[in-house]
């Protein structure tokens, strides 16, 4: 059965023609089961979506453990019969909760990508501007930007700093701070200058090297901006849910962890 409206509707019609009470049991397999469960639930069936591990460990008492779609279907049916009275009923999630959970899944994926891209940029800078990522300790901004990343977008090679006089770099750094909205410090400018002049890049200062660093920075900045946007959207979605104040009052829960807890656990008010 393909996941089209016509074929799933035909499946619902065939199930309705069966004698006796019919319950539909399916494994929770990513998002693959979602359209089937949603349509059959809407058609009035008792639908139960069970954890795949519960079914996998059920009835493994055969010496031969072949795995085919037919055998899996029989195994699911037997599991459903044995747990008929305790099968959890599938209830479609509210739109807000569904979108919050989806946003969090995407947030997790982008976080992994961001870590990979950040490590890649640091590795490149180790050959062009060693320890450039250690020049600043400022936390990321709300839009996802980080000071050290913005800095190396302009001063991508240590020669971009030590190739200037101390006075010229200080003036250029002050102009850069003003452009990007960072606070300027004369002492910090001198520290950066001393650090850059105490390093050397094994990668030559060429257009190719600049291209490599700029592309790595561009990808990282794009991913960081996407993460910041997702974080803001998760905060907005979570704040519209009734359990939000309860979660946010928990010890150690902040604006980042709170929406994540709600996305994973759901309405915590059901626990007593």
Placement of each model-derived feature along the sequence:
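A detector of single, family-specific signature residues
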Residues: 1-272
């Amino acid at each position: 059965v393909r996941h089209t409206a016509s074929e799933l509707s035909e499946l619902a019609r065939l199930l309705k023609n069966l004698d006796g009470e019919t319950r539909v049991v399916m494994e929770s397999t990513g998002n693959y089961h979602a359209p089937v469960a949603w349509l059959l639930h809407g058609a009035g069936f008792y639908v139960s979506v069970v954890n795949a591990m519960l079914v996998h460990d059920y009835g493994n008492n055969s010496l031969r453990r072949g795995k085919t779609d037919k055998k899996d279907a029989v195994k699911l049916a037997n599991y459903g019969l044995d747990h008929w009275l305790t099968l959890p009923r599938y209830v479609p999630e509210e739109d807000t909760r569904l979108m919050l959970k989806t946003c969090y899944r995407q947030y997790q994926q982008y976080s992994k990508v961001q870590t990979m891209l950040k490590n890649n940029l640091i590795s490149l800078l180790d050959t062009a501007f060693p320890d450039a990522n250690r020049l600043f300790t400022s936390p990321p901004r709300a839009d996802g930007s980080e000071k050290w990343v913005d800095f190396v977008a302009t001063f991508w090679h240590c020669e971009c700093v030590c190739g200037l006089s101390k006075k010229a770099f200080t003036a250029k750094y002050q102009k850069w701070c003003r452009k990007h909205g960072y606070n300027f410090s004369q002492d910090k400018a001198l520290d950066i200058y001393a650090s850059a002049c105490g390093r050397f890049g094994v990668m030559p200062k060429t257009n190719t090297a600049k291209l490599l660093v700029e592309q790595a920075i561009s990808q990282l900045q794009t991913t960081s901006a996407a993460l910041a946007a997702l974080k803001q959207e998760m905060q907005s979605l979570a704040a519209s849910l009734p359990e939000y104040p309860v979660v946010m009052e928990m010890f150690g829960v902040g604006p980042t962890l709170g929406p994540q807890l709600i996305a994973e656990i759901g309405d915590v008010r059901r626990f007593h």
